Amino acid sequence: MIKHALSVTRDGDFAQWYQTVISEADMAEDSGVRGCMVIRPWGYGIWERIQRLLDDRIKATGHENCYFPLFIPLSYFEKEAEHVDGFAKEMAVVTHHRLIQKDGRLVPDPEAKLEEPLVVRPTSETVIGAAMSRWVQSWRDLPVLINQWANVVRWEMRTRMFLRTAEFLWQEGHTAHATVEEAQEETRKMLEVYRDFAETCLAMPVVAGEKPENERFPGAVSTFSIEAMMQDGKALQAGTSHFLGTTFSSAQDIKFQNSEGQFELAQTTSWGVSTRMIGGLIMVHGDDDGLRVPPMVAPWQIVIVPMLRDQPEDAATIDYCKSLQAELAKLTALGEPVRALLDLKAVKAQTKRWGWVKKGAPIVIEVGGRDVAGGNVSVIQRNKLYREDGKLDSRIMPRGDFVAEAAAILESIQQGLYLDARERLDSNIRRDVTDFDGLAAMFADSVKFPGWAEVSWAKPTGAELDAVVERLKALKLTFRNVPGTAAPAEGTCLFTGKPAVERILVARAY
């Protein structure tokens, strides 16, 4: 019987398991502010890898990085009614610029009230739109293709680390174009960048498609998303791309003179992913021993743990490990130099080993005196942790053989994690549900892992759509997206009985 590293299992309590992984893997912790987390070095290291790999892809599509203020005048939001309605309940607002002492406490100085309240950035369409209105005068100034890595604040009431926090980190792209066609192409292109990034780098298979009307970003003409399946069967929206039309260019006066001398409003887009991707990574790849980090986003791909015994031969063991680390650093795997760490912390080797297992380091190497004498290493692969007899699978390999195979092992781990998650996604989307009673039975409380349903619908709008959404809420379900790869709709709409026009995903979601 396997004795796992975590006290809570996925089958026993998935929500508590998720929190336990974050804690035991030293990913993050609560701060003194409700809903704001401290991202610890291992968690932030994963975010840095996400930043680096995604930033390269964003720049490869012609975008440039920039930075805009954290504080946005309230009047900017008031110009776009639908947008402000969508975020009003989540906005943090600054009203004073100074504190004073009063009765032994610090309080806002009533004499220091701002002339206009400042909203702490929930998203940047408004402030970037104001800048674009200054930058764009002629069709020659288009397109504008910019991206920002920043923090945002949305005052969430029900928070969960990495998934829903009052403050989170993200990138947000914003573009302006001369035509609808160019802007729509940009929207689809960046959705594909996200899909490829999630699947290639995070080993996280996703379904890309368009959101229904009720799930659109406030102010958007159309919203597209990538949706990932977690190990409990719920969906996670891992990234979005929005075609905004002239909603924000009209509000912020982003207009240009076309080649015929006539003035037009620019067509704009926005798109973003956040630290929510790390929450998805945990729930897609984690197991009952902690996190499993795909090698492409692992801060350290190989961790070397010397087995020291306070003996004279310890010096030789450390030298052996240092030379091994240097050898590994010369290798290339998955398109980059191998990232190898020698852990020399004054902690017992067994404690270090299990610490790195819980963190999800792809490969842990243990080196003791016998290994040095025999020219060997002991190899633990995080995706193949146990033997068939339930014991830890620590393989002894000749050092030269391991160095020769290290890159291939890392690549196999990356591919293996993806294939496992891909099989879970593909085998748990049901396409045979044809009526609402069948949908209700599929998602009955007694069903532990319902997965997702892809169903035919008539694309209702307005009050008819609102009524459908309320019926889904009773089952704790939401529409996810209309998959771009879905088969043509057949028969009638599961919700209205009208002729179906497309297929849409329905699931419980984070």
UniProtKB/Swiss-Prot annotation:
EC number(s) in its UniProt entry? 6.1.1.15
Using the record for this protein, list the coiled-coil segments as residue ranges, or answer none.
none
Q: Which GO terms describe its biological process?
A: prolyl-tRNA aminoacylation
Q: Where in the cell is it found?
A: Cytoplasm
Q: Does the keyword Transmembrane helix apply?
A: no
Entry-linked PROSITE patterns: AA_TRNA_LIGASE_II
Q: Which GO terms describe its molecular function?
A: ATP binding; proline-tRNA ligase activity
This protein's major location comes to cytoplasm
Q: Which SMART domains match?
A: ProRS-C_1
Cross-referenced CDD domains? ProRS_core_arch_euk
Superkingdom of this protein's organism: Bacteria
Q: Which reaction does it catalyse?
A: tRNA(Pro) + L-proline + ATP = L-prolyl-tRNA(Pro) + AMP + diphosphate
Do the record's keywords include Phosphoprotein? no
State any GO CC term. Answer: aminoacyl-tRNA synthetase multienzyme complex
Subunit (UniProt):
Homodimer.
What family does the database annotate? Belongs to the class-II aminoacyl-tRNA synthetase family. ProS type 3 subfamily.
Q: Read off the PANTHER family from this record.
A: BIFUNCTIONAL GLUTAMATE_PROLINE--TRNA LIGASE (PTHR43382:SF2), PROLYL-TRNA SYNTHETASE (PTHR43382)
Reproduce the free-text note on domains from the UniProt record. Answer: Consists of three domains: the N-terminal catalytic domain, the anticodon-binding domain and the C-terminal extension.
Function of the molecule: Catalyzes the attachment of proline to tRNA(Pro) in a two-step reaction: proline is first activated by ATP to form Pro-AMP and then transferred to the acceptor end of tRNA(Pro).
What protein name does the entry list?
Answer: Proline--tRNA ligase
